[in-house]
């Protein structure tokens, strides 16, 4: 079922806001706190949110109708980064527990864990929306083959 224009607008606005948040986390945790784990995962979350935004904008402009292979690529990229984010989450959680770090410390691996989960969320959403939009246009492409 195709989303309404309002749903697409809300999804695009949320993706845009989240990409700005991810990029700001990247810069703050790189420059101020010098915590590369949190900076990397925040930056990855920002890039993935931007990618989801591009997916929504291309759907609104009806660009995917002629390029369904691109949606398949977006799906696999989302699946790849889901695996990367999940493994980073497990790694940061293990490091935080074994090093007995505090929850309140901005340099702890627990914060990297949070941003790994947020990156996982955006990677999952990228795969989900690519799959849904591809299914939406697959019906149309079958009809256009005749």
From Swiss-Prot:
Location (main, coarse): membrane
Transmembrane segments: 12-32, 40-60, 73-93, 110-130
Lipid bilayer topology: Multi-pass membrane protein
Keywords noted in UniProt: Cytoplasmic vesicle, Endosome, Lysosome, Membrane, Transmembrane, Transmembrane helix, Transport
GO process terms (BP): erythrocyte differentiation; heme export; heme export from vacuole to cytoplasm; heme metabolic process; heme transport; localization of cell; lysosomal transport; phagocytosis
Span of the annotated motif Di-leucine motif: 142-143
Molecular function terms from GO: heme binding; heme transmembrane transporter activity
Cellular compartments per GO CC: cytoplasm; endolysosome; endosome membrane; lysosomal membrane; phagolysosome membrane; plasma membrane
Coiled coil location: none
Subcellular location per the Swiss-Prot or TrEMBL entry: Endosome membrane; Lysosome membrane; Cytoplasmic vesicle, Phagosome membrane
Matching Pfam families: HRG
Catalysis: reaction(s): heme b(in) = heme b(out)
Function: Heme transporter that regulates intracellular heme availability through the endosomal or lysosomal compartment. In macrophages of the reticuloendothelial system, is the heme transporter for heme-iron recycling. Essential for macrophage iron homeostasis, transports heme from the phagolysosome to the cytoplasm during erythrophagocytosis (EP).
UniProt record similarity statement: Belongs to the HRG family.
Name of the featured protein: Heme transporter HRG1
Species assigned in the record: Rattus norvegicus (Rat)
